[in-house]
Amino acid sequence: MLNKEEIKKIIPQREPFLMIDEVEEFTPGESATAYKYVDEKEWYFKGHFPGNPIMPGVLITESLAQTGAVAILSLEENKNKNALFGGIDKMKFKKQVTPGDKLKLEVKIIKRKGPMGVGEAIASCDGKIVARGELTFAVV
């Protein structure tokens, strides 16, 4: 289990844009499982949407990307590097994420070639899939 301070030793994102709270498990270069505890005080709820707060799909996707970054940047050869989006494919949003939800984030690296790769990403709450798709990344 990694806490936020340990996560910051692997990925470069910082508050308020650090979108994962803890990493349950990870295998360098292969996979990672993380959690985002969705708090009612999150900065984005002020405008998305007042009176009906919903976590934006793009931020669910970013949370998944940061989870995948833990897997790929924890490789010794990628220390002190960054993982950038190369593309988002087949991303589907199935349920809303709201304050109080515990968002489970799972990413499995399914393809790697040089600095490029693809991760299969699934976000879920209470065992129900809220989003899934493929994230292409480049390590720089």
Q: What are these regions, as identified by a protein language model?
A:
Residues 15-55, 60:
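Catalytic strand-loop segment that frames the active site of acyl-thioester-processing enzymes
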Residues 8, 51, 93-95:
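Beta-strand-rich interaction surfaces with strong enrichment in secreted/lumenal proteins
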Residues 21-24, 89, 94, 108-110:
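Conserved positions in beta-strands of structured domains
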Residues 12, 37-39, 106-108, 120:
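Extended beta-strand/beta-hairpin segments
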Residues 23, 55-78:
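Active-site helix/loop of acyl-thioester processing domains in fatty-acid/polyketide metabolism
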Residues 29, 98-101, 108-140:
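HotDog/MaoC-like acyl-thioester-processing domains
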Residues 2-14:
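Short aromatic-glycine motifs in intrinsically disordered, low-complexity regions
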Residues 1, 68-104, 132-138:
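Hydrophobic beta-strand-centered segment that forms part of the acyl-chain substrate-binding groove
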